[in-house]
UniProtKB/Swiss-Prot annotation:
The species this protein was found in: Helicobacter pylori (strain HPAG1)
SUPFAM superfamilies named among the record's database cross-references: YhbC-like, N-terminal domain (SSF75420)
UniProt key word Cytoplasm: yes
InterPro entries in the record: Ribosome_maturation_RimP (IPR003728), RimP_C (IPR028998), RimP_N (IPR028989), RimP_N_sf (IPR035956)
Alphabetically ordered keywords of this record: Cytoplasm, Ribosome biogenesis
One annotated GO biological process: ribosomal small subunit assembly
UniProt function note: Required for maturation of 30S ribosomal subunits.
Protein name: Ribosome maturation factor RimP
HAMAP family for this protein: RimP
Amino acid sequence: MTKKIEEKIEGVIESLGYLLYDVSLVKENEQHVLRVSLKNPNGAVSLDICQQVSEVISPLLDVCDFIQDAYILEVSSMGLERTLKTPKHFKLSLGEKVEVKLINKESFQAVLKDANDLSADFELEDHAIKSVGYKDLKKVKTLFEW
């Protein structure tokens, strides 16, 4: 269902100048919550941006009626530290520092240099490039350095 929602709202969000990072539908305290997270290619995602996107996509979602039950719409920034789960997440996080854990228990920190639909390339501290298929990744998380 979230894939249908994503397909419906992605173009609208892009027409406003922002990028759709993720859509998730969760149940919290007996209430359905539809979370839409954004990336602003020109800087931070402000509260005004979240409100603007919410006001545009809310009526669209109501008309499409993808979610039968009542729900709360939450629009937010994708966040500074987040787990990368899909090729899209990797592509929208290029240039960021990440912590990588592989299925074989190897782990390292690197800069995410490139990503496609099958793998991601990481620049290690010695500037070597390590290419890893998504199937070999256990967890990849962005790191924010204070």
